[in-house]
Design a protein with these regions (language model features):
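Short, glycine-rich nucleotide/cofactor-binding loops
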Residues: 50-60
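Short, Lys/Arg- and Gly-enriched loop/turn segments at beta-strand edges
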Residues: 39-46, 52
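Structural motif
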Residues: 49-51, 81, 137
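Ferredoxin-reductase
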Residues: 1-31, 35, 48-49, 86-89, ...
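Short, surface-exposed secondary-structure boundary micro-motifs
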Residues: 37-38, 227
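Short internal beta-strands
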Residues: 9-10, 76-87, 111-114, 161
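Histidine-anchored nucleotide/phosphate-binding helix
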Residues: 59-73
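Reductase modules of NAD(P)H-dependent flavoproteins
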Residues: 88-228
């Protein structure tokens, strides 16, 4: 791939509208409109080692990083270790690619763990095999529980960046009632938002149509800046 082409990794999920269409019905010549890419995981590594932690679909940004590091030859000088968790052997993606990268770049190594077949989940034992955390940049991506575990286990890393593709469970206190006033900086309009309701839903009820995508706060398309 080059700067003019994108590679999309799509896993079909049960009753998934977009993934089912892409896997079953999309054809050569279809025109798709994509938003701007988003993410804080960059390839400029300032520590002696980079550790990538991926669970499930969290492998996708890691693949992009690995490919970029290989193209820029940074893999020739920076040791990169990937630890990848999936449910079963069948769920592991891009294993041939990872094997090829490991064969071509001695600084790259990877391990795949199977949570359903062998119950190998991220834990303290994995941390103890890595040496001094203050010399490692750690990137982690996966479900919210996986990301939270990584944040706890690798809190002493020189750099720690996590991304989650599912939301943590949250329940508002039943006694937490009332409204919060939110003032929009562009229109200077003030909107009363019920506690426990998302800003996006409240704005839509007021006839305002902000940009949005997943409606869960994951894709960041509806992200906005808090002025104060």
């Amino acid at each position: 791939l080059d700067a003019d082409h994108l590679c999309l990794t799509v896993k079909k999920v049960d009753q998934g509208l977009v993934s089912s269409w892409l896997v079953e019905k999309s054809q050569v010549g279809d025109i798709l409109r994509l938003g701007q890419p988003y993410g804080d995981m960059q390839q400029s590594i300032q520590t002696p080692k980079l550790l990538l932690l991926a669970a499930g679909s969290g492998i996708t940004p890691m693949l992009s990083l690995i490919e970029s590091l290989s193209q820029t030859k940074q893999l020739n000088k920076t040791p990169v270790q990937l630890m990848y968790w999936v449910k079963t052997h069948q769920d592991a993606a891009y294993t041939d690619y990872l094997k090829e990268i490991a064969e071509n770049f001695p600084n790259f190594s990877y391990q795949i763990f199977y949570t359903q077949e062998q119950d190998q989940r991220l834990n303290q034992n994995h941390v103890e095999t890595l040496g001094a955390l203050n010399e490692i940049t750690v990137y982690a991506c996966g479900p919210s529980g996986f990301a939270s575990t990584a944040e706890s286990l690798f809190a002493e890393a020189a750099v720690l960046q996590t991304e989650a593709f599912s939301l943590s469970q949250f329940s508002a206190e039943q006694t937490d009632i009332g409204f919060i006033n939110v003032t929009l900086t562009k229109s200077n309009k003030t909107v009363a938002i019920p506690k426990g309701q998302s800003i996006l839903s409240s704005l839509e009820q007021q006839g305002i149509k902000p940009n949005h995508g997943c409606r869960m706060g994951i894709c960041n398309k509806c992200a906005c800046t808090k002025a104060q």
